[in-house]
């Protein structure tokens, strides 16, 4: 019964997201993209973890493509009494309430060797996880980006992002599914305003300690971009390795 209620609430939240997206919509139809991605995770200890993300984006109408390489290090603390699998975990663990992440992102347009788009970014994130009744997890993420855009004489800017996300784990045998919904506004120093908002709904499915599949649908509105509206299908393969278990 709880699972059914959660699914109903998740569906309602997703519906509200699409209605909000439609209300923001302009005259031009939204662009459509696919975002395949491979995320590799290496756990060094119960609190330290490294990761490498390789996402690619492709516009289904113009065939424009971008690729990124993301390197990250995580430190978690504030152990709780809750055991659960998070979206980016291979299995259920005792959850830490706080997580600090630092990383680097390098990105380029793929068909012109970076002429249309080149980015180098250093970023830091602070995560706070708040368990709610019924097994629902509410998480806050605050992220700060230091960005260098363009080749050669690159333009420096900063960006602040805040993400609010709700998720809940369901289990069946050895399998685990974690549906989620999130909203994330972006503040860009180039425009001195919140110019972008992302609305996401999806799920992560794990069946072993080595792999999980995550898929989501993203709606993005950006008031300062040539592509003001965007719908994207994101499919992520998570690969997990645990060096702490060999010690």
Label each PLM-derived region with a short phrase:
Residues 42, 75-77, 92-93, 128-130, ...:
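Residue-level signature of outer-membrane beta-barrel architecture
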Residues 25-68, 238:
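Short glycine/proline- and aromatic-enriched beta-strand/turn motifs that initiate or cap beta-hairpins
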Residues 54-60, 104-110, 130, 144-148, ...:
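Transmembrane beta-strands of outer-membrane beta-barrel pores
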Residues 32-34, 65-69, 118-122, 154-160, ...:
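Residues that define the transmembrane beta-barrel architecture of outer-membrane proteins
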Residues 47-52, 79-84, 95-100, 133-138, ...:
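Repeated loop/turn-to-beta-strand initiation elements of outer-membrane beta-barrel proteins
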Residues 73-75, 126, 229-247:
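Outer-membrane beta-barrel "beta-signal"
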């Amino acid at each position: 019964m709880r699972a059914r209620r959660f699914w109903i609430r998740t569906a309602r939240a997703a519906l509200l997201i699409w209605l909000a997206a439609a209300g923001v919509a302009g005259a031009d139809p939204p662009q459509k993209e696919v975002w395949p991605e491979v995320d590799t995770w290496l756990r060094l200890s119960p609190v330290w973890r490294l990761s490498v993300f390789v996402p690619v984006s492709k516009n289904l109408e113009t065939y424009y493509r971008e690729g990124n390489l993301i390197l990250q290090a995580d430190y978690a603390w504030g152990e709780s009494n809750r055991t659960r699998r998070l979206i980016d975990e291979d299995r259920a663990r005792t959850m830490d309430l706080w997580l600090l992440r630092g990383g680097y992102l390098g990105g380029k347009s793929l068909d012109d060797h970076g002429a249309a788009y080149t980015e180098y970014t250093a970023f830091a994130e602070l995560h706070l996880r708040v368990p709610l009744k019924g097994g629902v997890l509410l998480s806050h993420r605050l992220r700060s980006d230091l960005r260098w855009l363009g080749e050669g004489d690159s333009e420096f800017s900063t960006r602040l992002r805040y993400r609010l996300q709700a998720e809940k784990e369901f289990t069946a045998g050895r399998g685990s599914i974690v549906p989620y919904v999130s909203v994330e506004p972006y503040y860009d120093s180039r425009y001195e305003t919140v110019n972008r908002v992302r609305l996401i709904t999806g799920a992560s499915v794990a069946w072993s300690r080595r792999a999980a599949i995550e898929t989501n649908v993203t709606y993005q509105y950006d008031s300062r971009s040539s592509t003001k509206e965007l719908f994207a299908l994101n499919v992520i393969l998570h690969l997990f390795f645990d060096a702490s278990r060999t010690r």
